[in-house]
Amino acid sequence: IAAADPRARSPYLRRAEIKRTLLVVIAGDRGLAGGYNSNVLKQAAAEEGEVLVLPIGKRSAEYFVHHEVPLFTQEVLLAADVSVGECFQLSRQITEGYRKGEYDAVKICYTRFDSMMTQTAATMEVLPLSIEPTEQQKAEARRSQILYKPSSEEVFSAIIPEYVAGIVYGAVCESCLLYTSPSPRD
């Protein structure tokens, strides 16, 4: 869309100075996973600047309440019980807050699956979107006759919350898979 309509403007593409970040932090619901919880919580705690945290998982919520970090919600979302529908509801709240300027960036801290022997605490940048069309995409866009009805801005506004929901749900599923799978020492 950004390549096809160079005049497209969207709050999801803006590159402003990042003053406040919303961190979605996914940890386990129990403390039985050794480094699983501590690694992702250390990763989140290393985030620089002002943060607002959306904790997913009981250990995530307990950690940030104990450290008096501002929370996006007081509701405790159990990682093992988060549904696709809840992720879509969360994504609408996340994107609405982003559009209103309550925070300038959205990131997810979760445990990434590298292999059965290696899992890594990771931070994924979700918003603002980093979309730099290649020269080939720009050339193809100039040749194309794509006309957006509704406007490209309205299309962005409709699909980005869906995109964010998919990213959040994928990170929750990946983290929960690792949390519940047998460790190499089992």
List where the protein language model places each region.
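C-terminal beta-strand-loop-alpha-helix "lid" module of Rossmann-like NAD(P)-dependent dehydrogenases
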Residues: 1-181, 185
